Structure formats: C-alpha cells, structure tokens
Amino acid sequence: MNRASLEKDPHEVASMFDGVARRYDLTNTVLSLGQDRFWRRATREALQLSPSDKVLDLAAGTAVSTVELAGSGAWCVAADFSVGMLAAGAARDVPKVAGDATRLPFADGVFDAVTISFGLRNVVDHSAGLREMARVTRPGGRLVVCEFSTPTNKLFATVYKEYLMRALPAMASAVSSNPDAYVYLAESIRAWPDQAELAARIEAAGWSDVRWRNLTGGIVALHAATKA
C-alpha cells in the first residue's frame, strides 16, 4: 500500500500495524501530547458499562483500550486484524481475538456494547463494518465510535492541519519504527468525513439514536448509537 493511498487492502493495513506494534502505545502518547489517555477514559464513560455487560473492543490493537474498559467491571474482549498488535499486548490480561471487522467471528446479538477507537478509518468497507457491529450487538445494545474528526474552530482547524501534515510526520520519525504509517494516518484523517457525515453513515448502517460529542476541540469525536 502506497503511504499516500487511502485505497486500503486489509492485509496491507494489518501488515502496516504489525510493523509499528512494538512502539505503538508510546508513539500514540507522544503524538497526541498525552490526550490518548483522556480519549480512552471518555470512551469508557460514554459506554455507560455495568459489571454484567459483555463488550467488544474492536480494532483494539495492543488492548490498552480494552483494559480501560475492563476497569468498569464488564467482561471485555479485544479484537483486531493485526496479529502483531495483539501480540504486543500479550501481557495485558484480557481475552484477545484476531478478526476482520467486516466478518466478525461472533454469533448474532452476543454483546451488550461494541466500541471501536481510531480504527473505523482503517476498515476497508466501514459501512459493512458498522453493519457487522450491529449484527453482533443485542437489541438495545450500544455503540461508541471514537475517531479523529473535524475541529469546530476554523483557526484551530488550520493550525491542526499544519500539525498533521508537517509536525506529526517529523515527530513520528523520531519515535516510530515506521514513520510512513503516520503519514498515512495524517492523510486518512484529512480524508475522513466530519461529525455530521459520520453520524449519517452510522444511521444508514442500521443504528438508531445517533449523536456525537466533540473532544479536544473536535480533533476527536465520540459517536454513540443504539441498536433498535
């Protein structure tokens, strides 16, 4: 996959993440200026989990996000297409499953809640992925998508765009084993739909009561929805 290409082959995406797995968590903390911890906590709070819940954390990577969710007392499973990422998180004591977001290895309606953080952009057919998330969620179950989005302030949006295309790749070169992956990250964020468009796509995939909340000035948005 050319680093500038947003035409994603799933195996190439998995290979790209395999290549950055070892230093992935450190790189994310550095490049987000420590905001990644806040975003994970906000995702857990948005899910409103109880100890009886069964939760799918999709595109969980090294399972840092899954451990955060499990802090609620809910039973949580980490799923990711990158075996390398799951292996990098092997020490984290949560169940882990390798799987494709568009063909999940779970029965219908088995989860009370499904979440995906910073992974929907990397799903080849994200509409199919959203439908598959609905399939494995029980009626009345919840979805929370935590994803990069569009800053709401125009001046801030301009500064952020400069950071994405100039500073972020330079910083990634210093801390990541594969800085080209972060050029792809920047370009995929720029190409991603804004808050309202993503909400429409989530609704079109069969979810109801779709709403969103901006974090960090709209750099990230939490989209929540319910399965009818």
UniProtKB/Swiss-Prot annotation:
Annotated catalysed reactions: a 2-demethylmenaquinol + S-adenosyl-L-methionine = a menaquinol + S-adenosyl-L-homocysteine + H(+)
EC numbers, comma separated: 2.1.1.163
Keyword Transcription among UniProt keywords: no
Name of the top EC class for this enzyme: transferase
Functional pathway: Quinol/quinone metabolism; menaquinone biosynthesis; menaquinol from 1,4-dihydroxy-2-naphthoate: step 2/2
Alphabetically ordered keywords of this record: Menaquinone biosynthesis, Methyltransferase, S-adenosyl-L-methionine, Transferase
InterPro entries: SAM-dependent_MTases_sf, UbiE/COQ5_MeTrFase, UbiE/COQ5_MeTrFase_CS
Chain sites annotated for binding S-adenosyl-L-methionine: T62, D80, D100, A101, S117
PROSITE patterns, per the entry: SAM_MT_UBIE, UBIE_1, UBIE_2
GO BP annotations listed: menaquinone biosynthetic process; methylation
CDD domains tied to this protein: AdoMet_MTases
Molecular function terms, GO-annotated: demethylmenaquinone methyltransferase activity
Main function: Methyltransferase required for the conversion of demethylmenaquinol (DMKH2) to menaquinol (MKH2).
HAMAP family membership: MenG_UbiE_methyltr
UniProt record similarity statement: Belongs to the class I-like SAM-binding methyltransferase superfamily. MenG/UbiE family.
Record protein name field: Demethylmenaquinone methyltransferase
Gene source species: Mycolicibacterium vanbaalenii (strain DSM 7251 / JCM 13017 / BCRC 16820 / KCTC 9966 / NRRL B-24157 / PYR-1) (Mycobacterium vanbaalenii)
